[in-house]
Amino acid sequence: MITELHGIDIRENEPLKHYTYTKVGGPADFLAFPRNHYELSRIVAYANKENMPWLVLGNASNLIVRDGGIRGFVIMFDKLNAVHLNGYTLEAEAGANLIETTKIAKFHSLTGFEFACGIPGSIGGAVFMNAGAYGGEISHIFLSAKVLTSSGEIKTISARDMAFGYRHSAIQETGDIVISAKFALKPGNYDTISQEMNRLNHLRQLKQPLEFPSCGSVFKRPPGHFAGQLIMEANLKGHRIGGVEVSEKHAGFMINVVDGTAKDYEDLIAYVIETVENHSGVRLEPEVRIIGENL
């Protein structure tokens, strides 16, 4: 119990596999769930004062946490999840569920967020990764974000300063943490928006192994190629290391089929990269983030 942070939901030596989409990950020294920006600032100020490392996990969807876990503070934004509308501008806190946020936009007949209707994760993670699917991405609708700097300062970043690229944003280099973001949507027709979201979700269910734990799309799309196609051509569908295998349904996904570990994921990723490069000459680059310590 950290007396200086009394009243904040903080759990010691908490296994992170209970919170990640992959269902792998060792313990966090301290796992914190701030309810508001004040509690978040208190956690960061305490960690900085005590020279303890801290990081934000978001919804831990496109992420692998190593089996040794994470030292210091891990902060999850599950309770920072408010969504507000001001005209055609939607503002969401970083912990807001991305899929649920697209449903709110649909309910108010606002178009622009349809592409994200099936992407797991949080608003903060989506901005960090410039998440996208089916021709759309966060940068297309992004206006600005409030971020928390490593020193504990809160500032606003514009779309220009975010310097979005393919699965990239400037905060991947700066280390700033999104605490909320604003998006510019447009008036639309509820039925049209609903039909498009149903179509995209149907495609996702047909093509992606949603019935298994996974980290989503493992690799970035190499120029002129599709990662899943290259992996399939290298005869890697169904290849398994430990409890993790390349999905038979979509080779761009790796699924935790039975008691997989983070090491299984890392070993399989390395094997796929090497095998695909030997087969096609194309070196795949992981899209998934891998963090934490090995056992």
Curated annotation (Swiss-Prot):
Keywords: Cell cycle, Cell division, Cell shape, Cell wall biogenesis/degradation, Cytoplasm, FAD, Flavoprotein, NADP, Oxidoreductase, Peptidoglycan synthesis. It comes from the Bacteria. One of its GO terms (cellular component) is cytosol. InterPro entries: FAD-bd_PCMH (IPR016166), FAD-bd_PCMH-like_sf (IPR036318), FAD-bd_PCMH_sub1 (IPR016167), FAD-bd_PCMH_sub2 (IPR016169), MurB (IPR003170), MurB_C (IPR011601), MurB_C_sf (IPR036635), Oxid_FAD_bind_N (IPR006094). One of its GO terms (molecular function) is UDP-N-acetylmuramate dehydrogenase activity. HAMAP family: MurB (MF_00037). Belongs to the MurB family. This is UDP-N-acetylenolpyruvoylglucosamine reductase. The lineage of its organism: Bacteria, Bacillati, Bacillota, Bacilli, Lactobacillales.
